Amino acid sequence: MKRNKELLLSELNSLPGLSSFKKELECIVDVFIANEKKAGSGKKSDKFLRLVFSGNPGTGKSTAARILGGIYGELGVLSKGRFVEINRSDLVSEYSALTSAKIREAVSKAKGGVLFIDEASSLSENKTEAAHGAIDTLLALMRDNQNDLLVILADYPDKMKEFLNSNASLASCFHVIAFNDDNF
């Protein structure tokens, strides 16, 4: 099916600001459209199914994530239009086993759509076994569901940089998109 890039991006382009994100997303859409033409179906790229939205509050990260999920759905990259937004309190318990169960539940709800983890750096704040377990479980579930799950981690730039640097596996598997204060 031929994809009309302008139509796919129309909702995003109607928003004020987000200029750097719009340029980045246009490139991502080009990659998926080119892969679709080459392979006959929207070939998926892990690089664009694991994203970090780094920016201050009010820069449009949550809004952009919702729109991106819709675009990925239209491209056939994701099978459903689900958008699940969670934060640390939804995931981490004082017990590792309960933390793993909460993360599995969140991924299960989001499968086929977007799992948006706001203030993601707080997953590693207290350096407990449960916090480390949360990250390890999330990484394992991302691998297991890599073809039908968009995971977006969001946070302040300085906190996100520290978070990604705290775990080599995190840093290597996420593509970072910066949201500037002048976006709105």
What is each PLM-predicted segment?
Residues 59, 90-92, 121-123, 156-161, ...:
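Conserved nucleotide-binding/hydrolysis micro-motifs of P-loop NTPases
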Residues 116-118, 149-156:
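Structural recognition of the conserved hydrophobic beta-strand(s) that form the central parallel beta-sheet
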Residues 80-110:
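Short glycine-rich substrate-engagement loop in P-loop NTPases that contacts/grips substrate
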Residues 7-51, 70:
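Pre-Walker A (pre-P-loop) alpha-helix and adjacent loop at the N terminus of AAA/AAA+ ATPase modules
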Residues 43-81, 108:
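Walker A/P-loop
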Residues 107-109, 134-149:
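Substrate-engagement module of ASCE P-loop NTPases
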Residues 164-181:
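A short helix-turn-beta junction within AAA+ P-loop NTPase domains corresponding to the substrate/partner-engaging
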Residues 88-98, 122-132, 177-178:
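Flexible beta-alpha connector loops of hexameric P-loop NTPases
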